[in-house]
């Protein structure tokens, strides 16, 4: 067990994670006394705490996370908010089932804070960081699914290249994939630093804005956790769970996530989905969301200085409308 994991067990409320775009998230969620809210990605708990304080004395939060360490943190925090914070171990791909199992429907607001928490990134045993030596794992839930090492050591060069290009937008995808396949023929690739060194070798001595392994690690993490599929499922279910007037807020950290969220919001806010040029609407589509953020909200320079992790964050928000358009 890593030192960080041991400390987390001794003090579940200890965290290095600072919630991103907290003020904007609260503004768009607009928590109120007696409201019911879902934090679909509890993480360090910063957003949930703020929602609980803003919805005092009787607002409730269903705190969902796939990471058992985050759920332990939520259970510890729940003792400070008896009857108001409901910890839940699960993936937001099952959002509707989880909410219904708690009788937590309909709801007044749902927050998705996507990507990694600082605690996950800082724990070498989790295998998310290319700067810290650890096993090639990358699972949000270490008790479920296969680690990244399985992909790295069993997928073909063609499959790896497609993965790095599709989920990492990595321009050197094919060269990196070939290098991985050649290296694993000599010895298994089992650690984060081992993989990062291989990728850096392909990049050579060129100086880049980001570490050469950034995109490869992103692609592997997305694949291991099926993040985009989970996000698409979670967003679709979130709309169903919201009462009219309820708010949906999503914070994304890379272009693939943000693009998916933007397209989903636009589709759900559109009055018609017929192909351009169709003389009369025949699709029967009725909008279910009203956009609150025509453009994504970005962190201020001050927040980026204080919390560099927030640099790539993009927040989008929408409001559930009734079928009659109100």
Curated annotation (Swiss-Prot):
Keywords: Cytoplasm, Methyltransferase, rRNA processing, S-adenosyl-L-methionine, Transferase. It is an enzyme of class 2 (transferase). The keyword Ribonucleoprotein does not apply. Transmembrane segments: none annotated. It is found in: Cytoplasm. It comes from the Bacteria. One of its GO terms (molecular function) is rRNA (cytosine-N4-)-methyltransferase activity. Residues 299-326 are annotated as: Disordered. Residues 316-326 have a biased composition (Basic and acidic residues). Pfam families: Methyltransf_5. Specifically methylates the N4 position of cytidine in position 1402 (C1402) of 16S rRNA. PANTHER family: 12S RRNA N4-METHYLCYTIDINE METHYLTRANSFERASE, S-ADENOSYL-METHYLTRANSFERASE MRAW. Belongs to the methyltransferase superfamily. RsmH family. This is Ribosomal RNA small subunit methyltransferase H. It comes from Thermomicrobium roseum (strain ATCC 27502 / DSM 5159 / P-2). The lineage of its organism: Bacteria, Pseudomonadati, Thermomicrobiota, Thermomicrobia, Thermomicrobiales. The gene is rsmH.
């Amino acid at each position: 067990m890593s030192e960080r994991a041991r400390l987390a067990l001794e003090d579940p409320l200890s965290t290095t994670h600072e919630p991103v775009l907290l003020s904007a998230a609260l503004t768009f969620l607009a928590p109120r006394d007696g409201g019911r809210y879902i934090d679909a990605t509890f993480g360090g708990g910063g957003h949930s705490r703020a929602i609980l304080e803003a919805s005092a004395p009787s607002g409730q939060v269903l705190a969902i996370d796939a990471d058992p360490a985050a759920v332990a943190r939520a259970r510890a925090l729940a003792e400070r908010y008896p009857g108001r914070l409901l910890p839940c171990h699960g993936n937001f791909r099952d959002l509707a089932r989880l909410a219904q199992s708690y009788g937590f429907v309909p709801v007044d607001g749902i927050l998705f804070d996507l990507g990694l928490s600082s605690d996950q990134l800082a724990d070498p045993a989790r295998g998310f960081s290319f700067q810290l030596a650890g096993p090639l794992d990358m699972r949000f839930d270490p008790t479920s699914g296969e680690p990244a090492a399985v992909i790295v050591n069993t997928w073909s060069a063609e499959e790896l290249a497609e993965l790095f290009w599709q989920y990492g937008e990595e321009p050197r995808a094919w060269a990196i994939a070939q290098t991985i396949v050649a290296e694993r023929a000599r010895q298994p690739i089992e650690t984060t630093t081992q993989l990062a060194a291989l990728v850096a070798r392909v990049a050579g001595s060129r100086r880049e804005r980001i570490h050469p392994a950034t995109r490869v690690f992103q692609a592997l993490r997305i694949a291991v956790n099926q993040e985009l599929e989970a996000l698409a499922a979670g967003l679709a279910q979130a709309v169903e769970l919201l009462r009219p007037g309820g708010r949906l807020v999503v914070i994304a950290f890379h272009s693939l996530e943000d693009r998916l969220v933007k397209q989903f919001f636009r589709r759900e806010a559109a009055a018609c989905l017929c192909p351009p040029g169709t003389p009369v609407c025949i699709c029967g589509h009725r909008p279910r969301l009203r956009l609150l953020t025509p453009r994504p909200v970005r962190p201020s320079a001050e927040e980026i200085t204080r919390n560099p992790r927030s640099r790539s964050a993009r927040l989008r928000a929408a409001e559930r409308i009734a079928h009659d358009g109100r």
